[in-house]
Amino acid sequence: MKFNVLSLFAPWAKMDERNFKDQEKEDLVSITAPKLDDGAREFEVSSNEAASPYNAAFQTIFGSYEPGMKTTRELIDTYRNLMNNYEVDNAVSEIVSDAIVYEDDTEVVALNLDKSKFSPKIKNMMLDEFSDVLNHLSFQRKGSDHFRRWYVDSRIFFHKIIDPKRPKEGIKELRRLDPRQVQYVREIITETEAGTKIVKGYKEYFIYDTAHESYACDGRMYEAGTKIKIPKAAVVYAHSGLVDCCGKNIIGYLHRAVKPANQLKLLEDAVVIYRITRAPDRRVWYVDTGNMPARKAAEHMQHVMNTMKNRVVYDASTGKIKNQQHNMSMTEDYWLQRRDGKAVTEVDTLPGADNTGNMEDIRWFRQALYMALRVPLSRIPQDQQGGVMFDSGTSITRDELTFAKFIRELQHKFEEVFLDPLKTNLLLKGIITEDEWNDEINNIKIEFHRDSYFAELKEAEILERRINMLTMAEPFIGKYISHRTAMKDILQMTDEEIEQEAKQIEEESKEARFQDPDQEQEDF
């Protein structure tokens, strides 16, 4: 698809075109397109149509019918509406606070290049560029906000803004885009060989819908609802990695919680309604209409009802009791006719319910919500408002260990927010080449800071267990197993650590303060 590209995207368009030419040179032909599970809308375009500005992809994307964008917009709106439920918000806050940890004098996230083969000079330059990326994201202050948006929306986009005249200066700003207005597109370029379609390559880009905004660029005025093609290299894109059953749309981690969250909210509202309607004694009016004709009796009933009417309604959106139209009825009197002079008009009461203290249903749905979000049930706020008991980490449950693994999985998928702009800066400034980056990408590690208190508890517990094992094995050390084996297998020390500790022990043995006091008295 070829049409005018805005001047601010020109450097990125050249970069994408260069990558596509490199792809053509490799001549990697297949019978199927790559399955990347990244939510891109794929269009099959022949090699001849790829050069046409009005191919099938153009007509589909720029037409009035956009099922893909509508589905994405509805999904994100659904996830955001869930956050209005305080139960969902509390559970998501547990996930975000474990993934992004703020502590004094520590970096929220750091770059580890220890296993990479870059020279020390290159490593220092990469660390400086990584700091610039964090500054552009304001991650030290807004890291949890970025992670929360990514988790809730299931995706996050940043526009990499550079100076088109001086691209070697790198990224100037990372500007977040509305994920509901961005669409990821992949054109699959095919050729026909012996009646069979062969995939020759693919092109990727983003389509941004300006929605209700209008803007001016390159001396032209663009009205609201304009669709803009953005080169893939100009956008940072990180997604959840989860796809729906058809494998075409990205869904969020909140997708599993939609049903239990709505059921919990419905049940909580139903409990309020039930308690207000059944807890108080309701009035029962027996209106004596005597031998009145049916029409007169109905008019008399209506007159008494309008005079003595008592109606209370409950607004589920605010949780308030009020009396307005279009609200769910709560308490209302019963009105019954009496004839033939059996009794005069009287007011009686209907006893209220006596089982309104049962909350087991709400607790069950709350547990279902936390299980859907993979948050340990031990983190559900308890009715007693009790605190958390710490006992040197010995009470760490399997759920907490599973939750820690889940947090690491989320952090790993969120890493693209740092790696993509870092790679862009390194390439624009000529610090490394793209081949060097691809060769070392598996050795470039993003380390998220963990809660130091729990980390220390875990390390102390592990060390305590190793020392206890060493104490039990002490009678056999030197007889059945060697000291070196005990240090490596029981204390889990490496060869370097063993040599280092041996030298340190030898040096300390020469200092008086580290010698045995009893031995010193004997020598004296």
Curated annotation (Swiss-Prot):
Record carries keyword rRNA processing: no
Start and end residues of each stretch annotated as Disordered: 500-524
InterPro entries: Portal_Gp20
GO BP annotations listed: symbiont genome ejection through host cell envelope, contractile tail mechanism; viral genome packaging; viral release from host cell
Composition skew (Basic and acidic residues), residue ranges: 500-516
Subcellular location: Virion; Host cell inner membrane
Keywords from the named record: Capsid protein, Coiled coil, Host cell inner membrane, Host cell membrane, Host membrane, Membrane, Viral capsid assembly, Viral contractile tail ejection system, Viral genome ejection through host cell envelope, Viral genome packaging, Viral penetration into host cytoplasm, Viral release from host cell, Virion, Virus entry into host cell
GO cellular component: host cell plasma membrane; membrane; viral portal complex
Coiled-coil regions, chain positions: 486-516
Function as written in the Swiss-Prot or TrEMBL entry: Forms the portal vertex of the capsid. This portal plays critical roles in head assembly, genome packaging, neck/tail attachment, and genome ejection. The portal protein multimerizes as a single ring-shaped homododecamer arranged around a central channel. Binds to the terminase subunits to form the packaging machine. Attaches to the host inner membrane most likely through interaction with host yidC and forms together with chaperone gp40 an initiator complex to form the prohead.
Oligomer status and interactors: Homododecamer. Interacts with the large terminase subunit. Interacts with the major capsid protein. Interacts with the capsid vertex protein.
Family: Belongs to the Tevenvirinae portal protein family.
Protein name: Portal protein
Gene, per the UniProt record: 20
